[in-house]
Curated annotation (Swiss-Prot):
Residues the record lists as N6-(pyridoxal phosphate)lysine modifications: K242
Subunit structure: Homodimer.
Family: Belongs to the class-I pyridoxal-phosphate-dependent aminotransferase family. LL-diaminopimelate aminotransferase subfamily.
Name the UniProt record assigns to this protein: LL-diaminopimelate aminotransferase
Keywords: Aminotransferase, Pyridoxal phosphate, Transferase
Pfam families in alphabetical order: Aminotran_1_2 (PF00155)
Reaction equation(s) it catalyzes: (2S,6S)-2,6-diaminopimelate + 2-oxoglutarate = (S)-2,3,4,5-tetrahydrodipicolinate + L-glutamate + H2O + H(+)
């Protein structure tokens, strides 16, 4: 039988973080251990019934079983534009500044292909969602990490980047509310970033998937597009996944600079055929009618966050109280690397958390807890951690 060698771009990839966690989890579960998984950020709360009913109704329309538009239904894109206006007071032209995505991950993965040439520099604020550097590498880009440090509230020090690097940079990936640190961006930071990007002709790719999971009405996460001049240089990726508990539906959007949106759309029309239209129609209903349900989800996540923070404090594990996202970013106990602690925790207690170094070297010394199980299970998980 012939053997086929993987392309170099695959051979150099590290194991995908969450796939590796699933593998280890399966090994321990096979031994009969009760697993509490706080690893992957996949909401356990159900999609609201009214969204499911909208999908059911739309799926009965024969028109929705034909090929969809590559860029998405105009009605869906208009619903996105209306939602951005209501939520962030950002004006978007639905015909030019919005494109639908098969989940934001798909759009992020394809975006560098539209703008990165071999050898171009891509800056990634890290710890980071692994897709940013992988997608940039697939496009031939040279990736450099910009560390996010706790003493700077996990915001990049833009002045520490030399003018030479700014001039070489094609794309700068940022993510707020941040996965995994849960940090949020300030208007001052975004203003500084936009000014740097405009000065050096850099594209800002902002991942904003967690803006709707927040815990204080006075601390709502912001969109980079609220920043004056941001639309000149920025594209923002968003998703219905975390907001409405629709991770499996694969429905997202990219918005912002028209030429950046068009470039991404050009890639998409050559590699995919858009989102099932019934899902888009359900997405319209979610965007228009979902806020009362999202408010209830926030209350649940806040209760879970507070439960975890209180329990970690009792066992002297340090963490910053997050204002947003579905994660708690905690310091690894003294004497362990991130991977050592996570592996020991899983093997000896059955609790799955994510090692900080899985999000890049800047994540070493931390681990991430996902608030995706009920409060009783969270308490049980922290109780097991305390006995380690």
């Amino acid at each position: 039988m012939p053997e086929f060698k993987l392309a170099d771009r695959l051979a150099t990839l590290p194991p995908y973080l969450f796939a590796e966690i699933d593998r280890l989890k399966a090994e321990v579960a096979a031994q009969g251990v009760d697993i509490i998984s706080l690893g992957i950020g996949d909401p356990d709360l159900p999609t609201p019934d009214f969204i499911i009913e909208a999908l059911h109704k739309a799926a009965k329309n024969p028109v929705n079983h034909q090929y969809p538009s590559y860029v998405g239904l105009l009605t869906f894109r208009q619903a996105v534009a209306d939602w951005y206006k209501e939520r962030f007071d950002v004006e978007l032209d639905a015909t030019k500044e919005v494109v639908s995505l098969i989940g934001s991950k798909e759009g992020i993965a394809h975006f560098p292909l539209a703008f990165v040439n071999p050898g171009d520099l891509v800056l990634v604020a890290s710890p980071n969602y692994p897709v940013y550097p992988v997608a940039s590498g697939f496009a031939g880009g040279e990736v450099e990490i910009v560390p996010l440090l706790e003493e700077n509230d996990f915001l990049p020090n833009l002045d520490a980047i030399s003018d030479e690097k700014w001039d070489k940079c094609k794309i700068f990936f940022v993510n707020y509310p941040n996965n995994p640190t849960s940090a949020t961006a300030t208007p001052e930071f975004y203003a500084e970033l936009v000014a740097k990007a405009k000065k050096h002709n850099v594209i800002i790719a902002a991942d904003a998937a967690y803006t709707e999971v927040y815990y204080d009405e006075d601390k709502k996460p912001i969109s980079i597009l609220e920043t004056p001049g941001a639309k000149d240089v920025a594209i923002e990726f968003h998703s219905l996944s975390k907001t409405y508990n629709m991770t499996g539906w694969r429905c997202g959007m990219a918005v912002g600079n028209a030429s950046l949106v068009a470039g991404l759309g050009k890639i998409k029309e050559n590699v995919d055929s858009g989102i099932f239209q019934a899902v888009q129609e359900a997405g319209i209903v979610a965007l228009k009618e979902g806020e009362p349900y999202v408010k209830e989800f926030r209350k649940i996540y806040k209760e879970r966050r507070d439960c975890v923070i209180e329990a970690l404090e009792k066992i002297n594990i340090s963490c910053k109280v997050p204002d947003a996202s579905i994660f708690v970013w905690a310091k690894t106990p003294e004497g362990y690397t991130s991977s050592e602690f996570v592996s020991k925790l899983l093997k000896e207690t059955g609790v799955v958390v994510t090692p900080g170094n899985g999000f890049g070297e800047s994540g070493e010394g931390y681990f991430r807890i996902s608030l995706t199980v009920d409060t009783d299970r969270l308490k049980e998980a922290v109780s097991r951690i305390s006995k380690l």
